[in-house]
Amino acid sequence: MTFLSKLVQAGTMFSMLALSASATSATLETSVFNPQEKSLFPVSSVLITGPTEAILVDAQFQRNDAQSVVELIRKSGKKLTTIYISHGDPDYYFGLDVITAAYPHAKVVSSAKTQEYIIASMVPKKSYWGPILKENAPQELVVPEVLKGDTLMVDGEKVKIVGLDGHDPKHTFVWIPSSKTMLGGVVVFGNMHVFLADTQTPESRHLWYKTLDVIEQLHPTTVIPGHIVGNKPLTIQAVNFTRQYIQNFETAAKASSNSSELIAKMQASYPNIGGDNILVLSAKVIMGEMKWGQ
């Protein structure tokens, strides 16, 4: 059986991978919408489909991108049963009002930690980002229900949420056991500067390393980064890239006296990756030049 993983850029779907699996493998497929650098955050929304059903992981940041996700779901021809929000940052859930308007019967769920984070921060986040997003800001905010257990189902196949009871329940990831596919969410980046403004302490970054170790121990065949720029293969290399980037950033920060020096060092180390705006923000926060809670 062939397992297809597709990346959708600016509403156009193209095949990234065609991986051969055994006859006992699942019928589940993944399709990924990522607006790339046409939007503020190149965040991945992943549609997991079986023969008749589908679940969506993450709902985009901007209304126009959420509408592209709606079109992706419609083109699949599957029944959307569930929308899972993997993290509480607004680029994962601001698009929910668009998607739930199109699919009002789909259940919206998240982990308890994610729901708690969204409830505590969604109003100030909308106040901060609304003037920036303008017409692409959410018209209303949707709060997920808490997922019972750690398993979602698609046509009888399991999709697992890994890390709910682990070392860092706020940062989990999605795992499709039958196809050994991992959806990285907030913890895996690909070919772009890693967002570090939310992990301002060595302890928080140590937990991040541990999560990357857990992913590696699963030996995934396919890794879909939560944020990615370009057409890099969807492999374990994204996990390696993320870990090495964080290590290099920490080393560069210790050797820098201000954010400008840190930015210059990281751009010299990574001259051909995306997300310069993310680097600037991360550097200012880590060097203590900017407070970050948005």
Which residues does each PLM region occupy?
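Accessory terminal helices/loops
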Residues: Q217-T222, V229-Q294
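Divalent metal-coordination and catalytic microenvironments
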Residues: I48, D58, I73, H87, ...
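N-terminal signal peptide c-region/cleavage motif recognized by signal peptidases
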Residues: A18-S22
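Bacterial N-terminal signal peptides that target proteins for export
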Residues: M1-G11
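Conserved beta-strand hairpin/beta-sheet module of binuclear metal-dependent hydrolase folds
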Residues: A26-K75, F173-G185
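Metallo-beta-lactamase
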Residues: F61, I119-N240, N248
